[in-house]
């Protein structure tokens, strides 16, 4: 068992990298970890594929029952509080597969602690997805059409939050990968497949090692 954790700011392309890595993995060796969230689904997001979407009451119940191995609460621009997290049943620690998840720095530290507690602390590889700030902002604005003022404010809030809670992960993660264009995205996806198969080429070809 191995866990690859992708860490990166809003609109850094983490989802695109993950999907491309799974597309390249023809043998199904990499298993995507699906996070659970209490935020509303975006257009075209599918429950059980992109996220497990739950309401606030269900989220509180799951927290009370200690079902999450990591989670974080976000207060968004309209005052709502959203929960994102990974449930313990998403990762089989006895499996011979490689799991891949998208996570923030706080969640990464919780995941790291959880894996150490179950004797799998050496099975975690964390990769920071680095993108120029201007590109991230443009992607965020283009991701949704006809943005309301509240949605624009939320994008701004996320970017400010990233500087505090995500960008420090660049120094914390095992390695850093640039993702400023489609070519970078493909390289990142290939590297993830090398990591999943214990292929040393990922170390030689990584864009920036810590």
Model-derived segments and spans:
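Small-molecule kinase domains that catalyze NTP-dependent phosphoryl transfer to phosphate-bearing small molecules
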Residues: 145-197, 202-210
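Hydrophobic anchor at the beta1->P-loop junction of P-loop NTPases
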Residues: 6
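P-loop (Walker A) phosphate-binding loop of NTP-binding proteins
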Residues: 9
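Conserved phosphate-donor/acceptor-positioning beta-strand/loop module used by diverse small-molecule
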Residues: 98-106, 119-143
């Amino acid at each position: 068992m191995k866990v690859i954790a992708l860490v990166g700011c809003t609109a850094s392309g983490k989802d695109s990298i993950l999907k491309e890595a799974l597309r390249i993995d023809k043998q199904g060796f990499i298993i995507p970890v699906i996070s659970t969230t209490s935020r509303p689904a975006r257009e075209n997001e599918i429950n059980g594929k992109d996220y497990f979407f739950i309401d606030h009451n269900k989220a509180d119940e799951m927290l009370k029952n200690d079902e999450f191995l990591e989670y974080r609460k976000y207060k968004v621009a309209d005052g709502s509080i959203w929960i994102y997290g990974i449930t313990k049943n998403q990762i089989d620690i006895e499996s011979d597969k490689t799991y891949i998840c998208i996570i923030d720095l706080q969640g990464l530290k919780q995941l790291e602690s959880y894996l150490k507690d179950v004797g799998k602390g050496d099975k975690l590889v964390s990769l920071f997805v680095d993108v120029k700030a201007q590109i991230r902002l443009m992607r965020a604005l283009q991701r949704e059409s006809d943005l309301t003022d509240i949605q624009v404010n939320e994008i701004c809030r996320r970017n400010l939050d990233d500087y505090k809670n995500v960008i420090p992960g660049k120094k914390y993660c095992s390695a850093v990968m640039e993702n400023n264009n489609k070519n970078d995205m493909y390289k990142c996806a290939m590297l993830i497949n090398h990591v999943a198969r214990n292929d040393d080429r990922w170390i030689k070809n990584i864009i920036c090692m810590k």
